[in-house]
């Protein structure tokens, strides 16, 4: 039945065989002679398995089907016509059909195309199909061909190994012959003919028989068509058609020759050297490989060769890796010289002392100790590379074991599992890994071994023996494994003891390990030391600790040896020892493979997952776990690298030996931004390790001198106060600590500077935690007290005082107690920010208040006083003259302090400080007494001078006193502090003249109606104290008829302490005078007639104003608003007309008017720190000055107006117009300046879409904007700015990634209309861009220098512009834009691809894009130190965003750059710069007229002519141009080009000078500029110093 199936299906079977052969091939680089049946691919093993059945032809079910290939037909292999091989001398059928041939079956049964004319083959029978597999030859011994009598016995003598053999594939081309030969040789080996295949030398193991020869010949013909053979094969076969073995021999030789190059590369990549062989041998080996590669036209550079050699160095040579790691020019000869040097040194040292370790001359650390009774001490010289290095002997297997085995009982071996240990030294070995089979590790040549001796090794921590003959009490090893210096495993078979019997009958025993995989038997000196035995290498003896000689030691070669005759042999079976621990799992998967397959997960995670069956088809028992826990994956070490872990308390063991104040921790915090210059921006903290005492010092900068002064101070303080010397200071690696100045300071004082390691801030935990604690306290104290931020260091110092006095959770004493100081005196401490009243010991007048409100900060460091902050004076004082305020609420007024009143407690705690003492105030030592621009709100006085010349007269209206509406006033904006300095001092505040104001107008600023209301005489006055906490609006009730007569009787006043004075009787007689003034009076026109009359009321009171000079004598332009006299018309029937206030034009926020409050409490006079303070300098009369009868808690009065008049007279007489005017004028000038600035209307340069297109009534302009709009849209689509394939729903996108967009339209300077689609970067989220990226532009110094060089060298200047530059830069972040509203896509988003204009990162992206293109494609290099300046040998480019300025001696070089740019970018040529005539440029707003080799003129006349009139600033057309060559008489030499910053400033007197080149300029370079002195317009166009601002504003008014 089976034979019938074969007859019916011959082609399918044959095709399957071919599919199986061709579907899987052995790699071509595999050694053909090393291929065995066990190494065949899976299909070979499957084929063998299937064909291991009976010899009968298998059925179709037994043939494995290949589902991946279409089975080819047998006809696909074309048979050669007439057998292309030679016909003469062919084997006869009789020879081919010897008796033994029957055993191999018929030749026609092989899977091959038959040869019709070959006499060596029988014609195939059409009834027999070709089988799938070829029957192999037997393994019987060869029979001679002429032994005809034994034909019948041969088949019985042969034993078959395989029934069928997989045939090779058919040769398809001449180029594949070498690959085909590999498969053919494997086919012959599988056919039991491997011993007759010649090697590359042509040698064979035995002669083949005739039938074997015929078998090889026929199969070679079958699978290698003659016409596809290489030429050299054909030449061999033409000589001898049957010489197949010669073909195979030469093929093998050629394959090995072709693989030599690959072998050389592999050998070079796998170089290893540890000193076991001589350095000369190693150098010859490497040089030979490199030379052989060079002969094959492969040059190996010195750098590559050095890197490959360094990778394989180990042992004492390993440190060379670090030495050459940073070198760029590595020489092979130099590296060989270094290796030879180390090898020679080690050899010399080993000859002198066998226990000495090989070392480099630069790393010798000689230690010499004498032996004692407990431990063995051997004179060693150790090469310390790590802190844990140990003494080692040269060339010996250094072995280290766990401490669990040291000093163990000799009669018992601990069999418990030992955890793995990796020691720090490369030459030490560790235990704890499971044993696994490995080849013997013999890194030492054993030819120097002394037979029957033990090598004495000082570096080995365990004794190792190769023979179990001397091992007593041996137990199998189950878990212990040792690795050698090359990290190779040394399996341990057993653990036992060695018993010694020395000369004098002394017996001892040491632990030993048995392993056959070492070169020498090693005797560990550390094991002998445990038995009090010492090796004396000077007398060559083993001695006891008492000096008794136990045995001699012998020096042989480089080592010392102990004879084995002192060992007591055991009777243990060697076979038993070697077989006690066989590996139970041979076919387990290695753990590194599983580790990589499971994504480099950690060991515990993988093991636990397999236990929980989280991974199918893989069990825990299928993996080799022996080295899993200690396996180090290089990829994991690189990819998962982290900082080392800090163990709590690990630092203490290194510092517990220090005494108090010998070990300090220090760190710097800062800077704190947005502070006045007087406040410190940094602080430096110190902490003592032993006592944890803390110091803080303020710093204004981090310069070396500042840090050095602090260190000098604290070292002197500790030395004098605590009689201690600082030994160590720990700090980080900041430049303020690692500079040479501080290093020299530490060295001179013998202080050890202990730095943290790189990027390891946690190692500096003491100082870092202190800074965090102090800053937490600082924020809390400032927030609770409401004090300004510039007092932040006072809060830090207060926190330091408290922290030093409290006990920390980890200590049983406070820092003060540890330091031997007394505890904190609670009576000397006030809550931070406690309101107090400070005695003013130096008032300006005897009648001025003597108390100043303030806030307590912290106890003084330099006295017994307290540091108190005075908001009114804007400084801190050190004083004991203060009184604590009672019931004063702090900032947190929203809390109920009725139940939290601590007044009684504070009185009890500070009872002895409740009185004023002698005058002992001092200024704060670290400049906190200076005024701050951020401490308070400056005040602005109302200008009574007119701002315009035209005004109209109005009738004088009577006062309206019957209403008091609640209205809003406007608080002033913050201005410079120095402007309001006049109002800060207590002696310059209150007016001496009582006045009456309109009740209605008072709410709007205290305006007083007059008959003629002008901006000068009808000025609006603001009540400064309405808006200040603690101030009052309380005035005398003027609504009753009997009080309108200005009699002012029975007015009650209040003293500072809160007690009421008796009622003062006021004089009711008033003298009302009228004064005529000019609207713009001069100093000399006091009596001239004016266009309006102002009623001046002089109210003479006997009690207050008897000594006050007449008000009429004061011209109004010199009258400060603090002394402004109210203009009141006595006619009560006149109507009330309120004049417009100047403050209406100021951009001030509205504040709701507050009703008058009770001011009986003194504490309410303290200005609240966080409120907007105002005073009378805002332009109105102080409410407290109304009739001088309010319940005044204000600042002190002006002494008298006579002083002001005298100062004015002096001013006028000396005519000092160029100096600073009197302070009484500052506020008027400032208001005028602000008024003038307000009059300048801003000019909008851009339009929105609706303004430019939708509602634009100018049709021509609209059409131009529409054209520009479509042009921008086209450019956006052309550049693929966004993803046009998909719209995104805004609900599906993170709002942080969404940015609004808009179209803006403008008109450029050249008249063209421009449209730009931009992103709203003002609402861009910070997470969507990298804040560190910067958009660089060319510095003006670089541009001016390039222009000057171009002028001197006759360069061509070409100006270019790149259209839509930002759109060429890709965007890395995922961002979406919301289309503009006019597109109607309200709920859709677009995904950005390009850097759209307006994005934060667009400028940086474009800069990186164009920079990369200029460097890579245009062969440019960026000039170091000047960003956006690129240069090559011919062209210099200055880049300003999308504008380029090209400078070149040859115009063709510029054109070449332009051509290259046009390939990538849309480049426009603004000005090519060709020609010799004058060429005009407009570069970044700078107008340049340039004529090569003649002149270059720079200016801004055109742009200034267009811009300045828009700012209402007239342009002086008569400006004179000056010719200034720089500093007169000074010339720059070549040697003076490089100067430091200080010399630069001194030489050019602070001018922004250009960097000039003397050899370029030739002393002929002149700069033309317009000299502008201090101009009034500078107030609006420049940031000015305060004095310059005052001066210019004063000029403006006059």
UniProtKB/Swiss-Prot annotation:
Residues 579-636 are annotated as: Integrase-type zinc finger-like. Initially, virus-like particles (VLPs) are composed of the structural unprocessed proteins Gag and Gag-Pol, and also contain the host initiator methionine tRNA (tRNA(i)-Met) which serves as a primer for minus-strand DNA synthesis, and a dimer of genomic Ty RNA. Processing of the polyproteins occurs within the particle and proceeds by an ordered pathway, called maturation. The record marks 397-398, 578-579, 1232-1233 as: Cleavage. InterPro entries: DNA/RNA_pol_sf, Integrase_cat-core, PolX-like_BBD, Retrotran_Ty1/copia-like, RNaseH-like_sf, RNaseH_sf, RVT_2, TYA. Residues 656-831 form the Integrase catalytic domain. Mg(2+) 2 binds at residues 1361, 1442-1443. The capsid protein forms a homotrimer, from which the VLPs are assembled. The protease is a homodimer, whose active site consists of two apposed aspartic acid residues. The gene is TY2B-LR2. The C-terminal RNA-binding region of CA is sufficient for all its nucleocapsid-like chaperone activities. It comes from the Eukaryota. Residues 295-397 are annotated as: RNA-binding. One of its GO terms (molecular function) is DNA-directed DNA polymerase activity. Residues 1151-1165 have a biased composition (Basic and acidic residues). This is Transposon Ty2-LR2 Gag-Pol polyprotein. Residues 1-88, 359-449, 915-934, 1004-1034, 1059-1135, 1146-1165, 1170-1205 are annotated as: Disordered. Pfam families: Pol_BBD, rve, RVT_2, TYA. Residues 1-11, 19-39, 49-60, 399-408, 415-435, 915-927, 1009-1034, 1065-1082 have a biased composition (Polar residues). Keywords: Aspartyl protease, ATP-binding, Cytoplasm, DNA integration, DNA recombination, DNA-binding, DNA-directed DNA polymerase, Endonuclease, Hydrolase, Magnesium, Metal-binding, Multifunctional enzyme, Nuclease, Nucleotide-binding, Nucleotidyltransferase, Nucleus, Protease, RNA-binding, RNA-directed DNA polymerase, Transferase, Transposable element, Transposition, Viral release from host cell, Virion maturation, Zinc, Zinc-finger. Capsid protein (CA) is the structural component of the virus-like particle (VLP), forming the shell that encapsulates the retrotransposons dimeric RNA genome. The particles are assembled from trimer-clustered units and there are holes in the capsid shells that allow for the diffusion of macromolecules. CA also has nucleocapsid-like chaperone activity, promoting primer tRNA(i)-Met annealing to the multipartite primer-binding site (PBS), dimerization of Ty2 RNA and initiation of reverse transcription. The aspartyl protease (PR) mediates the proteolytic cleavages of the Gag and Gag-Pol polyproteins after assembly of the VLP. It is found in: Cytoplasm; Nucleus. GO terms for biological process: DNA integration; DNA recombination; proteolysis; transposition; viral translational frameshifting. Retrotransposons are mobile genetic entities that are able to replicate via an RNA intermediate and a reverse transcription step. In contrast to retroviruses, retrotransposons are non-infectious, lack an envelope and remain intracellular. Ty2 retrotransposons belong to the copia elements (pseudoviridae). Residues 369-381 have a biased composition (Low complexity). GO terms for cellular component: cytoplasm; nucleus.
């Amino acid at each position: 039945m089976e034979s019938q199936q074969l007859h019916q299906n011959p082609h399918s079977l044959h095709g399957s065989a071919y599919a199986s052969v061709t579907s899987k091939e052995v790699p071509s680089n595999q050694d053909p002679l090393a291929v065995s049946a066990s190494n065949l691919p899976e299909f070979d093993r499957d084929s063998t398995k299937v064909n291991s059945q009976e010899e009968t032809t298998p059925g179709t079910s037994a043939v494995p089907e290949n589902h991946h290939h279409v089975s080819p037909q047998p006809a696909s292999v074309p048979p050669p016509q007439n057998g292309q091989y030679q016909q003469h001398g062919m084997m006869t059928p009789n020879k081919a059909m010897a008796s033994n041939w029957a055993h191999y079956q018929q030749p026609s049964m092989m899977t091959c195309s038959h040869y019709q004319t070959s006499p060596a083959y029988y014609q195939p029978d059409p009834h027999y199909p070709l089988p799938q597999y070829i029957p192999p030859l037997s393994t019987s011994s060869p029979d001679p061909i002429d032994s005809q009598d034994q034909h019948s016995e041969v088949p019985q003598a042969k034993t078959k190994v395989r029934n069928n053999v997989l045939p090779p594939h058919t040769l398809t081309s001449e180029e594949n012959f070498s690959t085909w030969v590999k498969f053919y040789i494997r086919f012959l080996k599988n056919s039991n003919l491997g011993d007759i295949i010649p090697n590359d030398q042509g040698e064979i193991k035995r002669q083949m028989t005739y039938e074997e020869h015929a078998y090889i010949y026929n199969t070679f013909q079958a699978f290698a068509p003659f016409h596809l053979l290489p030429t050299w094969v054909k030449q061999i076969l033409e000589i001898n058609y049957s010489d197949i073995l010669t073909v195979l021999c030469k093929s093998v030789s050629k394959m090995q020759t072709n693989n030599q190059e690959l072998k050389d590369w592999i050998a070079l990549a796998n170089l290893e050297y540890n000193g076991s062989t001589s350095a000369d041998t190693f150098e010859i080996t490497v040089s030979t490989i490199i030379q052989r590669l060079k002969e094959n036209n492969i040059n190996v550079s010195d750098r590559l060769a050095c890197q490959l050699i360094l990778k394989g160095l180990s042992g004492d040579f390993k440190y060379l890796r670090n030495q050459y790691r940073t070198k760029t020019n590595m020489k092979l000869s130099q590296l060989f010289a270094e290796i030879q040097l180390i090898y020679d040194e080690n050899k010399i040292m080993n000859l002198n002392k066998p226990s000495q370790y090989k070392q480099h001359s630069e790393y010798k650390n000689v230690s010499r100790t004498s032996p004692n009774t407990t431990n063995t001490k051997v004179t060693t010289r150790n090469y310390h590379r790590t802190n844990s290095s140990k003494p080692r002997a040269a060339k010996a297997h250094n072995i280290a074991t766990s401490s669990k085995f040291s000093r163990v009982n000799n009669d018992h071996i601990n069999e418990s599992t030992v955890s793995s240990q990796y020691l720090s030294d490369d030459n030490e070995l560790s235990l704890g890994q499971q044993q696994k089979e490995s080849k013997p590790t013999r890194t030492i040549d054993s030819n120097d071994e002394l037979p029957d001796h033990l090598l004495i090794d000082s570096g080995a921590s365990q004794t190792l023996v190769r023979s179990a003959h001397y091992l007593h009490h041996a137990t199998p090893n189950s878990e212990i494994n040792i690795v050698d210096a090359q990290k190779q495993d040394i399996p341990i078979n057993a653990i036992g003891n060695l018993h010694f019997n020395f000369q004098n009958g002394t017996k001892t025993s040491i632990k030993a390990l048995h392993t056959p995989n070492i070169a020498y038997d090693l005797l560990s000196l550390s094991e002998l030391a445990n038995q009090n035995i010492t090796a004396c290498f000077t007398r060559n003896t083993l001695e006891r600790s008492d000096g008794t000689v136990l045995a001699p030691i012998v020096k042989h070669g480089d080592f010392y040896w102990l004879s084995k005759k002192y060992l007591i042999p055991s009777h243990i079976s060697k076979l038993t020892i070697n077989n006690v621990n066989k590996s139970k799992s041979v076919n387990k998967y290695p753990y590194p493979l599983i580790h990589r397959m499971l994504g480099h997960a950690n060991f515990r995670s993988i093991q636990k997952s397999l236990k929980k069956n989280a991974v199918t088809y893989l069990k825990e028992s299928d993996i080799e776990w022996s080295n899993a826990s200690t396996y180090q994956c290089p990829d994991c070490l690189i990819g998962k690298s982290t900082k080392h872990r800090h163990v709590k308390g690990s630092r203490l063991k290194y510092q517990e030996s220090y005494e108090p104040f010998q070990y300090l921790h220090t760190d710097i915090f800062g800077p704190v931004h947005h502070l006045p210059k007087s406040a410190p921006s940094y602080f430096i903290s110190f902490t003592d390790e032993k006592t944890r005492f803390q110091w803080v010092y303020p710093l204004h900068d981090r310069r070396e001198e500042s840090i050095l002064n602090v260190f000098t101070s604290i070292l002197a303080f500790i030395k004098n106060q605590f009689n201690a010397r600082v030994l160590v200071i720990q700090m980080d690696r900041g430049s303020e600590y690692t500079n040479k100045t501080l290093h020299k300071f530490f060295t001179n004082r013998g202080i050890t500077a202990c730095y943290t390691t790189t990027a390891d801030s946690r190692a500096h935990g003491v100082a870092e935690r202190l800074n965090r604690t102090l800053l937490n306290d600082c924020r809390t104290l400032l927030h609770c007290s409401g004090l300004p931020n510039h007092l932040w260091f006072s809060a830090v110092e207060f926190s330091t005082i408290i922290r030093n006095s409290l006990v920390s959770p980890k200590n049983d004493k406070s820092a003060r107690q540890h330091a031997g100081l007394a505890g904190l005196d609670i009576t000397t401490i006030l809550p931070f920010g406690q309101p107090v009243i400070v005695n003013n010991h130096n008032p300006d007048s005897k009648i001025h208040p003597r108390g100043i409100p303030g806030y307590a900060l912290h106890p003084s460091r330099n006295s017994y006083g307290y540091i108190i902050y005075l908001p009114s004076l804007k400084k801190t004082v050190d004083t004991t003259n203060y009184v604590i305020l009672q019931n004063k609420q702090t900032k947190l007024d929203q809390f109920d302090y009725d139940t939290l009143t601590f007044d009684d407690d504070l009185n009890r705690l500070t009872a002895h400080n409740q009185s004023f003492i002698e005058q002992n105030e001092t200024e704060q030592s670290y400049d906190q007494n200076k005024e701050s621009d951020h401490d308070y709100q400056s005040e602005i006085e109302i200008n009574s001078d007119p701002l315009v010349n035209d005004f109209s007269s109005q009738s004088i209206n009577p006062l309206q006193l019957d209403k008091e509406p609640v209205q809003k006033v406007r608080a002033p904006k913050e201005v410079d502090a120095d402007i309001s300095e006049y109002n800060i001092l207590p002696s310059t505040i209150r007016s001496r003249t009582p006045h009456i104001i309109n009740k209605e107008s008072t709410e709007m600023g205290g305006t007083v109606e007059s008959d003629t209301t002008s901006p000068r005489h009808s000025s609006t006055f603001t009540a400064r104290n309405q808006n200040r906490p603690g101030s009052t609006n309380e005035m005398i009730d003027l609504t009753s008829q009997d009080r309108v007569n200005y009699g002012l009787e029975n007015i009650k006043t209040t003293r500072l302490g809160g007690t009421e004075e008796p009622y003062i009787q006021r004089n009711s007689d008033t003298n009302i005078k009228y004064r005529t003034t000019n609207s713009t009076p001069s100093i000399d026109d006091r009596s001239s007639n004016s266009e309006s009359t102002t009623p001046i009321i002089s109210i003479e009171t006997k009690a207050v104003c008897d000594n006050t000079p007449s008000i009429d004598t004061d011209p109004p332009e010199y009258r400060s608003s603090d002394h402004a006299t109210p203009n009141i018309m006595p006619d009560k029937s006149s109507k009330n007309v309120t004049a417009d206030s100047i403050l209406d034009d100021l951009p001030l926020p509205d504040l709701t008017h507050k009703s008058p409050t009770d001011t009986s409490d003194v504490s309410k006079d303290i200005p609240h720190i966080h409120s907007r303070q105002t005073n009378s300098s805002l332009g109105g009369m102080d409410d407290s000055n109304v009739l001088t009868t309010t319940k005044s808690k204000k600042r002190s009065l002006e002494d008298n107006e006579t002083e002001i008049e005298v100062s004015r007279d002096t001013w006028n007489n000396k005519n000092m117009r160029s100096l600073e005017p009197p302070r009484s004028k500052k506020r008027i000038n400032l208001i005028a300046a602000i008024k003038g600035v307000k009059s300048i209307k801003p000019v909008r340069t851009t339009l929105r879409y609706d303004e430019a297109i939708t509602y634009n009534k100018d049709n021509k302009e609209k059409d131009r904007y529409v054209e520009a709009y479509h042009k921008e849209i086209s450019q956006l689509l052309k550049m693929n700015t966004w993803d046009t394939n998909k719209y995104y729903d805004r609900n599906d996108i993170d709002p942080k990634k969404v940015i609004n967009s808009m179209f803006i339209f403008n008109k450029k300077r050249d008249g063209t209309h421009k449209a730009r689609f931009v992103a709203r970067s003002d609402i861009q989220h910070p997470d969507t861009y990298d804040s560190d990226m910067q958009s660089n532009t060319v510095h003006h110094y670089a541009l001016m220098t390039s222009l000057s060089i171009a002028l001197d060298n006759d360069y061509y200047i070409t100006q270019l512009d790149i259209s839509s530059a930002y759109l060429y830069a890709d965007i890395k972040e995922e961002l979406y834009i919301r289309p503009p509203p006019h597109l109607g896509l309200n709920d859709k988003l677009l995904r950005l691809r390009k850097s759209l204009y307006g994005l934060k990162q667009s400028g940086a992206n474009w800069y990186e894009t164009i920079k990369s293109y200029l460097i890579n494609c245009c062969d440019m290099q960026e000039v170091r130190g000047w960003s956006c300046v690129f240069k090559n040998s011919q062209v210099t480019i200055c880049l300003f965003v999308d504008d380029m300025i090209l400078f070149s001696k040859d115009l063709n070089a510029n054109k070449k750059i332009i051509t290259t740019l046009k390939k990538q970018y849309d480049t426009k040529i603004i000005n090519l710069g060709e020609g010799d005539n004058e060429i005009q440029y407009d570069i970044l707003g700078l107008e340049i007229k340039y004529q090569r080799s003649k002149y270059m003129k720079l200016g801004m006349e055109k742009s200034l002519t267009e811009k300045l009139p828009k700012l209402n600033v007239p342009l002086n057309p008569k400006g004179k141009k000056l010719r200034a060559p720089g500093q007169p008489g000074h010339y720059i030499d070549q040697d003076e080009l490089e100067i430091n910053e200080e010399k630069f400033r001194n030489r050019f007197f602070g001018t922004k000078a250009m960097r000039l080149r003397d050899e370029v300029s030739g002393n002929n370079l002149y700069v033309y500029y317009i000299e502008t002195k201090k101009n009034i317009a500078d107030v609006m166009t420049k940031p000015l110093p305060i004095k310059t601002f005052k001066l210019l504003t004063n000029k403006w008014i006059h």
